[in-house]
């Protein structure tokens, strides 16, 4: 029997095949426990394997442009767990995503901005939501541009993908042609997004923010 990649990571962590900390183990245990609970009618949520695999498959169509030679993306098991959990868990009533907020903490050079770039590109153009707004934010514009530039690299390294987006570097905006959504990089000037309703808000380097005002505006 083949197990989906999200669940396989959880099983491997709980079997000590993958070294992980207590919080990761708790998230994996929750995943397994909730899959069992989902079999009962009163439980509000279920795990949609197709939706989980869909975003992981999307990630693996992308190209890593940085370096001497371009390489196809191969998602690591922990990345599969993050992506699959966020997109796969759904409400039984309405098929809405279960998780509206996530906190992802990774060590330096472990692909945090890369992962955020995947989420922004996917939810910007391939999630069927029309006229959405996706914000890549940080305390400073240079930091916000790191995630934005990850998306730009994905687009520029793939001729098919480049047909689906239009990049406006002068104002740090990407038009999503399929959904008519926009992806935009913003700095800690919170007034610039006050009143907007983001479909996806990414707060990069959250620990560097002096308060949670940006997070609250994106909620």
Segments predicted by a language model, with ranges:
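Phosphate/NTP-binding elements of NTP-utilizing enzymes
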Residues: 2-219
């Amino acid at each position: 029997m083949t197990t989906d990649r999200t669940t396989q990571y959880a099983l491997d962590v709980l079997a000590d095949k993958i070294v992980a900390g207590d919080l990761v183990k708790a998230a994996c245990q929750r995943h397994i426990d909730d899959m069992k609970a989902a079999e009962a009618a009163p439980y509000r949520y279920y795990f949609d394997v197709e939706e989980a695999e869909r975003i992981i498959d999307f990630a693996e169509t992308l190209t890593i442009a940085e370096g001497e030679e371009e390489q196809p993306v191969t998602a690591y098991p922990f990345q599969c767990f993050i992506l699959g959990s966020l997109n796969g868990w759904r409400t039984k009533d309405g098929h809405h995503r279960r998780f509206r907020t996530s906190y992802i903490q990774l060590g330096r050079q472990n692909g945090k901005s890369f992962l955020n770039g995947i989420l922004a590109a996917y939810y910007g153009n391939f999630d069927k939501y029309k006229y959405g707004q996706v914000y890549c934010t940080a305390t400073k514009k240079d930091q916000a541009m790191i995630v934005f530039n990850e998306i730009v690299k994905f687009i520029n390294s793939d001729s098919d993908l480049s047909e689906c987006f239009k990049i406006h570097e002068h104002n740090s905006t990407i038009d999503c042609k399929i959904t008519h959504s926009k992806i935009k990089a913003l700095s800690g000037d919170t007034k610039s997004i006050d009143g907007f309703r983001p479909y996806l808000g990414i707060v990069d380097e959250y620990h560097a923010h002096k308060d949670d005002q940006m997070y609250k505006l994106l909620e």
